[in-house]
Amino acid sequence: MVSGYDLTQLLPEKGFHLARALVGTEGTCATILEATVRLLPSPRCRSLLVLGYPDVYRAADHIPEVMEAGPIGCEGLDEVLVADMKRMKIHPRDTRLLPDGKGWLLVEFGGDTKEEADAKARALMARVAGGASNKLFDDAWEEEKLWKVREAGLGATARLADGTETWEGWEDAAVPPRALGSYLRKFRELLDRYGYQCALYGHFGQGCVHTRIEFDLTTREGIAKYRRFVTDAARLVVSHGGSLSGEHGDGQSKAELLPMMYGEELVRAFEEFKSIWDPDWKMNPGKVVRPHRIDEDLRVGAGYRPPEPRTHFAFPEDDFSLAKATRRCVGIGECRKHEVGTMCPSYRVTKEEMHSTRGRAHLLFEMLQGDPLRGGWRAEPVKEALDLCLACKACKGECPVNVDVATYKAEFLSHYYAGRLRPRHAYAMGLIHWWARIASRVPGVANFAMHAPGLARALKWIGGIAPERKVPRFATRTFRAWFESRRSLDAGSPRVLLWADTFNNFFHPEVAQAAVEVLEDAGFQVAIQPERLCCGRPLYDYGMLDLAKRKLRQILDDLRPEIARGTPVVGLEPSCVATFRDEMCSLFPHDEDAKRLREQTYLLSEFLVERAKGWTAPRLERKALVHGHCHHKSVLGFDAEQELLRRMGLDAEVLDSGCCGMAGSFGFEREKFDISMTIGEQKLLPRARACPPGTLLIADGFSCRQQVEQGAGRVPLHVAQVLRLALREKAPASPPARRRRRHRVRRAALAAGLLTVALGAVLLARTG
């Protein structure tokens, strides 16, 4: 049981265990500074068996039989949840892995060997033969995909099909597993009686059911209906011997109903227990004991009418409402994890709530409310909280309800700086496309200026760039110049538009050159976009949205013929592709060509896997260490990249390395350098340093490669370069040594040339 206080731990036969009695008191009795916990051994090997049933009720009926087989986990989901996922395009391919049925159990077994785990699963398959469709998964990748389907439950149920918001309030009730089938049937009847609809899923092995229901919490009538429903639901769960909360706790939303479950005498005992620890009742008042009413002190409440300011982004996924977007966060705190995944890199360094996705979303909510935050778009607490946001978009991909702080940050900064000058680095880094075009006319002079000791330091100060940060060198010949000087493949071949982004055009042209070679090997005629076009990705980091929209409008206007023909656009830089797939349609939600371009834009690996039919990926039997760009993982998805590497025969380890810490321009800023390197040192940089010389290090993001090069002394390859390497069937040269030698010679020549020019100018001045 999770509801109430576990006073049974104070009984003599339980050893009067105070620590265990405090578990679940929700901060109402004491503040826990540290705790010693017991850990259960994790099985070395696992197997996943998925059982399909005609409906979720019959799946629940079989829980006792399933649990007798000794699984280490048993999760359930219904057809409503799967339909919600398909509607919202959440793991649409992964849901196809489910066996036939309209209700499913995901049953996991463990063992010291794979054979032992599989044997347990097969024994259960034999027991349920004929009663359920079943599928045993032996592929770890497929197993991971199915667990992601289950984990996406909250995100898939946060909105109904018509956009109506759903709420917690009756989200984790639990009953004894033997009673689960009966409870679910009667709970569905209760939902129907009140006119509510929701998916049913959760930890069925423990009898815990998760729901999010479309309560109307903004009108008096809706709130009264909510109260009646929750009261009836509490009676139902108690009648089945269950608990109001099986996982999340009571808080305010259920505590008023605890007498229904425990009786008045035990509830008074809860009060006495709290009084011993907290005689002044200052610890989290209004929760668990002597609680607020379930229908008061609501986050929204009757009469809730949030302001709807004019915004650049349309927020189409939130009914075109920034206010609704700021209500996405439901407070679970997934963004406060410290180890796995990417979200949230700045929080992992500072450990401050305001730097978590949850903290930032709540501050924006309070800013719009004007209570308690004042100042609107000029609210300094919001600016401070967003300042360390790396705009990695990990929250959009990993947050269960897809809070998108990167977009909120860009919107906020556009208003915060309206009519005001931005910091120096905003102009240095945000306008990098313009500076790069200028520098490409005289790359030698630009490189000398940015790397000559005294001059480089002065220029970095002017641009707000950290003096410790190494600045990438401009290529002596841009990719565009190289491309325009060569003959393309026969015009009869299928045409693709390779997006020559700022970074791979002006700094790393070898990446784009490799992509051309690979695409032509796959049988495509390659073209590139007109020179003036740039997606404007760096502009978002500084809220330069007027300029960003202008850049995207140019793209739509210039590419309309290509869009109309359905020409695929292939990108190399994940953040640029993400701009087309994400920001563009939020800035131009009613432009049909923007929607078409979103569907026609691919990352190179996606295009080769999905569109290069009949092409066989070149083999390269090597080991590889792979770091995924944040936008690649959160917006685009990393499956295609992994599939391409698999087809190549690479023994590739995809690192759970989080964010590299560079995050575009973030790591270049003077004030952000230390936190940038701290983020990189958490996982990525140590692994990169330890990477054996014969193992390929792969990173598609330009900023990721820059961070690894400076922080680990290794030069990663883009997947395009790895493909070209495979095509040429030879080992890569040593990029670091070759580039340094070339740069030393070039630098010496440039220095001599500039010195000659300077001396000549001095002589002319004197003779004049």
Predicted regions and their residues:
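Glycine- and acidic
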Residues: 43-49, 102-110, 164-175, 210-218, ...
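Non-catalytic terminal/interface segments that mediate subunit docking, oligomerization
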Residues: 120-122, 134-137, 144-200, 221-234, ...
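Short beta-alpha connecting loops at secondary-structure transitions
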Residues: 45-49, 168-170, 217-222, 252-261, ...
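Short coil/turn segments at secondary-structure boundaries
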Residues: 77, 136-139, 158-162, 247-249, ...
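Iron-sulfur cluster-binding cysteine motifs and their immediate structural context
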Residues: 285-287, 328-366, 394-413, 701-703, ...
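Repeat-solenoid scaffold signature
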Residues: 255-263, 272, 276, 386-420
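Noncatalytic alpha-helical scaffold of FAD-dependent oxidoreductases
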Residues: 1-202, 207-246, 250-339, 345-346
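Iron-sulfur cluster-binding electron-transfer modules in prokaryotic oxidoreductases
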Residues: 278, 285, 406-768
